[in-house]
């Protein structure tokens, strides 16, 4: 099994609900280590750059607006198959379709305010981690 890194963002809706600790507990219970973390209030420019891959999609402006509506908690997770493990913990993008016990089923309000973001592949994980955490700010443990 491969040790991987993945980016996770606890979105403004979940931060506002004060469930950061509950979500962190799920990461740790699944064997994922938080090796970098910070709380930030993304600017429109930062959110726009991060989600640039969606720029031509109809939901892009709403996504950028939502991601800048309040603080987010950004973390780099590390562990065996971290990308797939985190995506399993998150559940389906639409919380109505998410399995019971997943982060989105338990904490998300809608397909837009869906509590968390997670990298979907090793290539995107590397780009996303580097976007928020230059190498000197990530510490394996």
Swiss-Prot record:
Lineage of source species: Bacteria, Pseudomonadati, Pseudomonadota, Betaproteobacteria, Rhodocyclales
Subcellular localization(s) per the UniProt record: Cytoplasm
Catalyzed reactions: a 2'-deoxyribonucleoside 5'-diphosphate + ATP = a 2'-deoxyribonucleoside 5'-triphosphate + ADP; a ribonucleoside 5'-diphosphate + ATP = a ribonucleoside 5'-triphosphate + ADP
Full protein name: Nucleoside diphosphate kinase
SMART domains in alphabetical order: NDK
EC number: 2.7.4.6
Organism: Azoarcus sp. (strain BH72)
Enzymatic class: transferase
A Pfam family of this chain: NDK
Amino acids binding ATP: 11, 59, 87, 93, 104, 114
Record-linked HAMAP family: NDP_kinase
InterPro entries: NDK-like_dom, NDK-like_dom_sf, Nucleoside_diP_kinase, Nucleoside_diP_kinase_AS
Family statement drawn from the similarity comment of this UniProt entry: Belongs to the NDK family.
One GO process term, biological-process aspect: UTP biosynthetic process
Molecular function (Gene Ontology), one example: nucleoside diphosphate kinase activity
NCBIfam families assigned to the protein according to its UniProt record, in alphabetical order: PRK00668.1
The keyword Membrane is annotated on this UniProt entry: no
Positions annotated as active site in the UniProt record: 117 (pros-phosphohistidine intermediate)
Keyword Magnesium in annotation: yes
Gene coding for it: ndk
Principal location listed in the UniProt entry: cytoplasm
Function: Major role in the synthesis of nucleoside triphosphates other than ATP. The ATP gamma phosphate is transferred to the NDP beta phosphate via a ping-pong mechanism, using a phosphorylated active-site intermediate.
GO cellular component assignments: cytoplasm
């Amino acid at each position: 099994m491969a040790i991987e890194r993945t980016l996770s963002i606890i979105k403004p809706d979940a931060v506002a609900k004060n469930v950061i600790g509950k979500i962190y507990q799920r990461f740790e219970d699944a064997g994922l280590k938080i090796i970098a973390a910070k709380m930030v209030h993304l600017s429109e420019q930062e959110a726009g750059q991060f989600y640039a891959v969606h720029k031509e999609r109809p939901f892009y402006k709403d996504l950028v607006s939502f991601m800048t509506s309040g603080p987010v908690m950004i973390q780099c997770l590390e562990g065996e198959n971290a990308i797939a493990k985190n995506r399993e913990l998150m559940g389906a993008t639409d919380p109505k379709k998410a399995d019971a016990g997943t982060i989105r089923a338990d904490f998300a309000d809608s397909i837009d305010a869906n509590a968390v973001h997670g990298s979907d592949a090793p290539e995107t994980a590397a780009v996303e981690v580097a976007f928020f955490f230059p190498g000197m700010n990530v510490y394996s443990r």
